[in-house]
Amino acid sequence: MTDFTNSEKATNYQAVGEFNRTFGHPANTVFQHKIFDENPQTVKLRLDLIKEEVGELVDAVNENNLKEILDACGDILYVVYGMGQVFGINLDHKGPLESIEKPGYPKFSRNYSVNKNVFTESYQDVKKLVDKISDTYNCLDLSVAEKNIGDVSYHLYTILTFVYELSDLVGFDLDEVFDRVHRSNMSKLCLNEQEAVETIEHYKTLPGFESVIVKYRLAVDNKRYVIYNAESGKILKSKYFKLPNFSDLLE
């Protein structure tokens, strides 16, 4: 597994590659042209993850909830980069919209200050960008149905671009948000088998999980443990999962 030092910081895309490898998900380096036919369950999972997070963003905007907007934007980046890793689409490469600085690397260099009046001053602009993100997801869904990996690549990058534009409009450092989401996502791991067993028992008590088969397996480091939905393959959180904290970014 690649170990990035402080002097060689991973890009956002590379960080998600670290997550995928640690949790036993693919981190491919070449286009997976046959993935639509050979692994449709994985394709569906990746689409569903993006759809879920885009829906969270729509809800956050409708509720004028800045904290949830930050959270949703960070999560959208994560699942879009995740789909890129699985499909072998290097989202560190320059995307289709050349006028926009490359998402995730290098970082934007500006002083950020969240505009707490954005819903009164720029609501229509925010809404337009969120609509663009939703529309692009629909285009992505269609491209997957058509098994067109070139268009899938285009739409993934376009979603990233619009999310970065939204973060710029609202006034927050999306790369910092992403870093916090990444640290939080890595805390989904159980540190030992005892934590994994406790987490399995914990899910048995949660509403909505009555018919869900939750299992655990060793992570690739052969030390920590991954909790997952046995039917869908979706990664689930450790009982000791730590939510990302954005409170200081909203001050």
Curated annotation (Swiss-Prot):
Gene3D superfamilies: putative ntp pyrophosphohydrolase like domain. Pfam families: PRA-PH. InterPro entries: NTP-PPase_DR2231-like, NTP_PyroPHydrolase-like_dom_sf, PRib-ATP_PPHydrolase-like. This is Uncharacterized protein L479.
